[in-house]
Amino acid sequence: MNEYNFSDIEKSTQEYWRKNDTFKTIEDNTKEKFYCLSMLPYPSGTLHMGHVRNYTIGDVIARYQKMQGKNVLHPMGWDAFGLPAENAAIKHKKSPYEWTKSNIAYMRSQFDSLGFSFDWSREIATCDEDYYKWEQWFFIQLYKKGLAYRKNSVVNWDPVDQTVLANEQVVDGRGWRSGALVEKKEIPQWFLKITDYADELLQDINKLDNWPEAVKTMQINWIGKSKGLTVKFKVKDSNQEIEVFTTRPDTLMGVNYLGIAPEHPLALKEAKSNSQLAAFIEECKKTSTMEADLATQEKKGFKTSIKVIHPISAETIDVWVANFVLMGYGSGAVMSVPAHDQRDWEFAQKYNIPLKQVIESNDNKLKIDLEKQAFTEKGILINSGEFDGLNFKNAYQAIKKYLTKQNKGYETTNFRIHDWGISRQRYWGCPIPMIHCDDCGAVPEKEENLPVRLPTDVALTEAGSPLKDIPEFINVACPECGKPAKRETDTFDTFFESSWYYARYTCPTSNQMLDQEANYWLPVDKYIGGIEHAIMHLLYARFFHKLMRDQGLVKSDEPFKNLLTQGMVLKDGAKMSKSKGNIVDPQELIDKYGADTVRLFSMFAASPEQSLEWSETGVEGANKFLRKVFNYAELNKVIFAKNITLESQKLTKEDKKARFEIHSNLKQAIFDFDKSQFNTVVSACMKILNTLNNYDNLSESVKVEGFSILLRILAPFTPHLCHYLWQQLNLGEDILHTSFPTVDNNALEKDEFLLVVQINGKLKAKLELDASLSSNQVEEVVLADEHVKSFIDNKQVVKVIYVPQKLINIVIK
């Protein structure tokens, strides 16, 4: 008998796929389309187990849908721009382009060795000119519409990587890659007006029926829509006003001070004549702009000489510069109510600012101790003049009416989300296609001159982008007036590239950004990736899709119909990482066990949404199962050569039992496939093989039927072995182009059933009965059974409870 030689089987199968262009996809309006997409990887150089799991999930789905008869698009590409390539290039003394392309070539070979069904004819790399040309074109369209703009902005500045970091890229006050303490810095930045789409992004979350609730909740919170009042505080002895937004106008009469951001114009003005304030503002520049960090860091403030007038009581109120107020949020000012806000309470305790209670609890028994903490619940107004006794709802309306009438405030809808800063001060990215002219200002590059090419022959150092030092790149003529001008040296945030790549896969060689093929394939039917992308990539991609729709490039409102967020791969309970020394190299596993074993283990060890705990024993178990599959084929290959067909009238009792088990497991497998519960699909495969092995006298036709069903269920998981056996057993040419098995409902109709017999609730017997018996007949047969009679003779049968074809309970006394 031949041994399972996974190496030969996998190489020959992959060669077959290559020769036959098996995975190439073209548009076909006669078939239902299915677009299956896994998030494109960063080409780091080698695959890790997280990659293997993620892309196996996508491949299983793509292959299953193909066997369902659908026209499946399953592309792959590379998120190739970004700082890691730049840093690696400096370290290895290579250009980022060379380093990236070398990594792509190796990782593509690793993907192929795993048998992934990617259509490589659609491959894209975001660093290729043919790709980024179109995002430059798109940016220019957005600029013309006023959706892209440039302004000075306080940013998170990484002094080591010499670039701006998004709030999400700051971890514990440090840059996510360099680990350097992040500083605040004001520089010109390019932005996209995501706030113009905030309402639609929020409302359309209701359309995402097949997204995880956790992701939707994170996006809802990130967009952060809230209704409140904007209140005007007049600056004393000045015509100026400070506006603040609040969702709690019921606490307005308890305002003890205003907090303004260190970068607020009033703070900067006073700092010119106050060296201590100037020093405090400099100190604040070294603190994070992350909201999460602001919540936990020490609250610091500096009392200014500025006073404001309360809009209702006309009391004079102090203004403090506070390190927890951000200039980029609202007006850069907040009203502070220490008695009813915990952050304000902590600040007031530190600086001995008095508290004024203006809310009491609805619960008279609740004792409020403002010496211990703020009372933050809604309740009844006190110490609030004409508003005393009102609850929150009535106070909101009364105060809104008063402020609006006096022109001292108005109702506002606010969003937590802010415009997306897309500038990065690094080299290895897509050049922003703008030119700065002293006379004309910022001017877009002429579309016929696109792409603005990123120079590849550059000397990289750790001191920021070299683009500003390349005369032939930076010195250009103004597209409008022709005078000498300077090219923009910022590059796009890499999330810009990954926000639309899914659409470019539909027409990767098109001489426009997108063509009609995009509307054939979009939206993506199944998108697979980590939940860590919930509020950056997934939100930006939704935003981009709406921008492309409004540009007439796509017709759908949302990019991804169904989102699957896979769990992490763990070892010893921790995420695999080099720093922890718990990395498992997929290539070593492929060499030792074969790609099919690695794929099968990664799908069987846990359901996709759960974390997968690495287990060498589990890998060995997966390999053992595949050897059993191979051996069954070897032992029965003579049968398959006979070209036998199933004849139901010739089936034995054993055949019928086996077919019931096989088709029951097939039915469960189809249900679980559609729910993406792949671990239980694999379990069904194992049960089918056990059925085939456990019956000694199965008809040859049932063996052929059962094993062909097994191979087709297993094929999306272990495509090499199943392809090989399908051909070896003369079942067909290519299992991928074979229809997925369907359940024979006749096989699920049993001639007999196993009945559990209980007496007074205790198991006494199991009887195999004819399925055609009525309830009365079942009762008669059971009561006449000799074994059962031994328990009920000389006893009174009080009642008989029958659960059809499952259980009968005889109550006696």
From Swiss-Prot:
Location in the cell: Cytoplasm
InterPro entries for the chain: aa-tRNA-synth_I_CS (IPR001412), aa-tRNA-synth_Ia (IPR002300), Leu-tRNA-ligase (IPR002302), Leu_tRNA-synth_edit (IPR025709), M/V/L/I-tRNA-synth_anticd-bd (IPR013155), Methionyl/Leucyl_tRNA_Synth (IPR015413), Rossmann-like_a/b/a_fold (IPR014729), tRNAsynth_Ia_anticodon-bd (IPR009080)
Motif 'KMSKS' region in this chain: 575-579
Span of the annotated motif 'HIGH' region: 41-51
GO cellular component, one term: cytosol
EC number: 6.1.1.4
GO molecular function terms noted in the UniProt entry: aminoacyl-tRNA deacylase activity; ATP binding; leucine-tRNA ligase activity
Keywords annotated in UniProt: Aminoacyl-tRNA synthetase, ATP-binding, Cytoplasm, Ligase, Nucleotide-binding, Protein biosynthesis
Protein's UniProt keywords contain Ligase: yes
One Pfam family from the record: tRNA-synt_1g
One of the protein's GO biological processes: leucyl-tRNA aminoacylation
Annotated catalysed reactions: tRNA(Leu) + L-leucine + ATP = L-leucyl-tRNA(Leu) + AMP + diphosphate
Residues binding ATP, per UniProt: K578
HAMAP family: Leu_tRNA_synth_B (MF_00049_B)
NCBIfam families cross-referenced by the UniProt entry: leuS_bact
Protein name: Leucine--tRNA ligase
Lineage start: Bacteria, Pseudomonadati, Pseudomonadota, Gammaproteobacteria, Thiotrichales
